[in-house]
Amino acid sequence: MEIKQIITEIKQKLDAKGGLKHVYFVACGGSKAAIFPGLYLLQSEAKTFSATTYTSNEFVHATPKELDERCVAVICSLKATPETVKAVETANAKGAITIAMTGSMETGMAKVGQYVVVYSNGAPQDYSNSNQACSLRIGFELLHQIEGWDKYDKAMDAYQYINEIVDEAKKECLPAAQAWAEKEKDEPV
């Protein structure tokens, strides 16, 4: 299911319960860094609901008291670390709606998440469908479908340019990166 359809379905469920009150972005390590764009977007733009981030273990062992059926938990891990799978289970147990962002449909997170977003994570990389891009897309859809966000069309249009922009940047930076690597290759670590 596409992110747009996922959020449409989630919105219908939340509307029946009084609406969305909070979005939790949960992950650890590099995945936590990758979901930050969605968190930042919602913290900056949302007017009728709030958003925070937790590490997976923190979410499991210091579960927020306000976590309930009016919350969405966006939980991310490429290979579904055990603590991140447990975070999905924790959110499910509290009645929250879970979106498991993961590297394949075979992961433990994909098995326990109510909704699953599989993001691009290999070669060749589709940056418009990376974990960062999917985190943002979830945020854009929540803002659009819940609040009628006026920048939605422009944001969605931008996805068509992401791969081209990244490819150009890689080409532009490669000579400098190679020169730096050659210069520093014998430095002690």
Task: Label each region the model flagged.
Residues 2-5, 50-53, 75-78, 164-172:
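Short, flexible loop segments at the rims of nucleotide/cofactor-binding pockets, characterized by
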Residues 2-19, 168-185:
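A short, well-structured juxtamembrane/interface segment
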Residues 38, 48, 180, 184-189:
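Acidic catalytic cores of enzymes that act on phosphate-bearing nucleotides/polynucleotides
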